[in-house]
Regions:
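Signature of multi-pass transmembrane helix bundles
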Residues: 7-33, 48-51, 76-247, 407-413, ...
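Membrane-water interface of transmembrane alpha-helices in multipass transporters/channels
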Residues: 39-40, 75, 171, 207-215, ...
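Short amphipathic alpha-helical coupling elements at transmembrane boundaries
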Residues: 41-49, 139, 170-185, 247-258, ...
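Hydrophobic transmembrane alpha-helical segments of multi-pass transport and channel proteins
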Residues: 50, 86-90, 94, 221-225, ...
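Transmembrane helix boundary and interhelical junction motifs in multipass membrane proteins
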Residues: 58, 193, 264-272, 302-308, ...
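Membrane-interface alpha-helices at helix entry/exit sites of multi-pass transporters
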Residues: 73-81, 181-188, 278-294, 322-323, ...
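Helix-loop-helix junctions within the multi-pass membrane cores of secondary transporters/permeases
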Residues: 254-336, 394, 407-415
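Transmembrane alpha-helical segments and their short flanking loops
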Residues: 307-418
Length: 418
């Protein structure tokens, strides 16, 4: 027993990032040496499943508890967060238009993807998003509908604040703390989960996607990296007035890296909340803004929809005018905000955007098929960009408020001791 305790202590004594990198390397090596060891891949499935399973419960109890205690203050910070989420999503779509014009690509169309749930227009996408607000609360938790979870958690928390006994509020607070502890245990096992996810990806996909669709993939990933490393930091600098890169790299390292392998913004919500706690953010604030960001902060989705649509237009020889490109940017940004309410996410919103240029649904669905082929890389980078951005802008709004109040920013950001 002592030996086991020592092993656990040594494991916990190593930085989580170092452990994840070791797991990543081991997973890649195992995939090349023993590609038939399916049990390794199951570790990844278990990790993602655990995160997806606990995330809806975590969001509900934390938001409800914060409101029931009467300490939640959705002040100007919340408005700033929503503004930053929407602004960066639109800018991402606009930048995708610019890069597509600078580096136009055509593709070999794949077999059409099969789906019965392709949205017919922007109205349907936004209608689905609004309908999700009032979905059955139990169903919302079971299906991971975070718009619905947020709505009912707010209703429950406000009602509990009004009529709940003090002992009930304490129980709700203790429940939130208990769920948060479970999340910490799950995240502590991330190296094994990442090892399994890397193993599955390397052993099943290899490098084949880079040969046939390399240019399209390079354009998508390059645009997302430009957004993550240039545009978002510039916006953060405007609000913070100091070098944003320590925060950017920390969010990419501690949020984006995990999101890259889980390929799920929902699964990464617990990871992001743990990171917000480390950054010293207000729990009452980030408990709402992080789940909301997983729904509407969709820079990567806006880039994917825009570039894939313009690639389809280039393939068919359709000339896209500047006004049409601006309309596409707005449509992609709004559609991306509703991507979480559509089965298949950003890829199945491509036909909606293609309809702007009169591209047939058959061709649009072939582009969706291409998307699924390159998805192992495209979707990974997209999710990493989206998820890291959730924390970046929640922190930016919070630290901006600190500056206005004369409060010192964190030492890691300014390099000055407080």
């Amino acid at each position: 027993m002592k030996t086991l305790n020592k092993a656990v202590a040594r494991y916990n004594g190593i930085s989580l990032i170092v452990r994840i990198l070791v797991g990543l390397i081991i997973g890649a090596v195992l995939a090349l040496v023993a590609p038939g060891a399916g049990w390794v891949g199951e570790l990844g499935n278990l990790f993602v499943g655990a995160l997806k399973g606990i995330a809806p419960v975590l969001v509900f109890v934390i938001v409800a508890s914060a409101l029931a205690q009467g300490s939640s203050k959705l002040d100007r910070r919340f408005g700033t967060v929503i503004w930053l989420y929407m602004l960066t999503t639109f800018l991402a779509a606009a930048i995708a238009v610019v890069t597509s014009f600078m580096f136009p690509v055509t593709v070999v169309l794949a077999d059409a993807a099969q789906s019965d749930v392709v949205p017919q227009g922007l109205g349907e996408v936004m209608g689905t998003l609004l309908t999700n607000f009032v979905a059955n609360p139990v169903s919302a938790i079971m299906s991971g509908n975070y718009i619905g979870i947020l709505f009912w958690a707010c209703m429950f928390g406000v009602a509990m604040k009004k009529i709940g006994a003090e002992s009930t509020k304490v129980f709700l607070s203790n429940t939130a703390d208990a769920v948060s502890q479970i999340v910490r245990w799950i995240i502590n096992l991330a190296p094994f989960g990442i090892m399994g996810l890397v193993y599955s990806n390397v052993s099943s996909n290899g490098l084949s996607i880079f040969t046939q669709y390399g240019k399209l993939l390079a354009l998508l990933v390059g645009t997302m990296l430009f957004m993550a490393l240039i545009v978002s930091p510039l916006i953060m600098f405007i609000y913070l007035g100091c070098n944003p890169y320590p925060l950017v790299f920390r969010c990419l390292r501690e949020s984006g890296l995990t999101a890259f392998f889980t390929r799920s913004s929902a699964a990464n919500i617990p990871v992001n909340m743990a990171l917000c706690e480390k950054l010293g953010l207000d729990k009452d604030m980030y408990s709402v803004s992080i789940p909301l960001g997983a729904t509407i902060n969709m820079d990567g989705a806006a880039i994917t929809i825009t570039i894939m649509t313009l690639a389809a237009a280039n393939t068919l020889g359709i000339q896209v005018s500047l006004p049409a490109a601006i309309v596409l940017s707005a449509m992609s940004a709004l559609g991306a905000c509703g991507a979480s309410g559509v089965a298949g996410g950003s890829l199945l919103l491509i036909p909606m955007a293609c309809s702007l240029f009169g591209i047939s649904n058959d061709v649009a669905m072939q582009m969706v098929g291409v998307g699924f082929i390159i998805g192992v890389v495209q979707d990974s980078v997209e999710t990493a960009l989206n998820s890291a951005g959730d924390v970046e802008f929640a922190a930016t709004a919070e630290y901006h408020q600190w500056s206005k109040q004369g409060k010192s920013l964190p030492e890691f950001l300014t390099g000055k001791k407080n």
